[in-house]
């Protein structure tokens, strides 16, 4: 019996090691209680301190069962956005499942911010304290690769409800980004053809 119990403990330890974060505590509290969140939109340029949406210390707030924050890396207008989100129990369950299967990039001890990092932005959610999405706070975080929030929540729609210009600006940016990438690749094709011709002819 002791041998069997010892084997079970060893099996759990091995499974935890293989799955990395599977046995770590989930960063979000699975609760329906509300938290107060900072709600604002910060522009790269021309952001007026008189606007209530600007992310200053006196920014407006909202309430949800979680807060979110998004930092843009290369957006044409937007720098930072934050607000509230209301996760249903199934969304929280799906998010925890995505977390277990996503690539972990960085984790701080006692992480309370759950973040996804992509080529253009970093998005985080939290709900363990009021205003946990305040840009001026420095809370421990866990960051995962792209795919963490896929199929769970659409932050673009939530941000558009705060600032209706967001979707129009970002859709234009993505179109220009894809077009420039395509043209760059097309201009590179003749060089590839010349190299291949040179290699095959020798």
From Swiss-Prot:
Localization per Swiss-Prot or TrEMBL: Membrane
Chief location bin: membrane
Signal peptide stretch: 1-19
Keywords: Membrane, Signal, Transmembrane, Transmembrane helix
Transmembrane segments: 177-199
Membrane topology classification: Single-pass membrane protein
GO cellular component: membrane
Protein name per Swiss-Prot or TrEMBL: Uncharacterized protein F46C5.2
């Amino acid at each position: 019996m002791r041998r069997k119990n010892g084997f079970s403990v060893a099996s759990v330890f091995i499974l935890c090691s293989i799955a990395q974060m599977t046995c770590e505590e989930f960063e979000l509290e699975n609760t329906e209680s509300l938290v107060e969140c900072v709600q604002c939109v910060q522009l790269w340029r021309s952001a007026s301190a008189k606007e209530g949406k600007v992310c200053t210390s006196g920014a407006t707030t909202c309430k949800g069962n979680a807060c979110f924050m998004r930092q843009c890396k290369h957006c044409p207008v937007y720098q930072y956005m934050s607000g509230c989100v209301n996760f249903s129990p199934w969304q929280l369950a799906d998010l925890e499942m995505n977390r277990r299967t996503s690539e972990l990039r960085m984790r701080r001890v006692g992480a309370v911010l759950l973040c996804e990092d992509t080529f253009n932005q970093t998005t985080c959610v939290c709900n363990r304290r009021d205003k946990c999405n305040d840009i001026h706070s420095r809370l421990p975080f866990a960051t995962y690769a792209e795919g963490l929030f896929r199929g769970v929540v659409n932050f673009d729609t939530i941000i558009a409800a705060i600032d209706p210009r967001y979707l129009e600006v970002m859709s234009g940016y993505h179109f220009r980004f894809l077009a420039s990438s395509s043209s760059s690749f097309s201009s590179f094709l003749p060089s590839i053809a010349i190299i291949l011709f040179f290699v095959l002819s020798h």
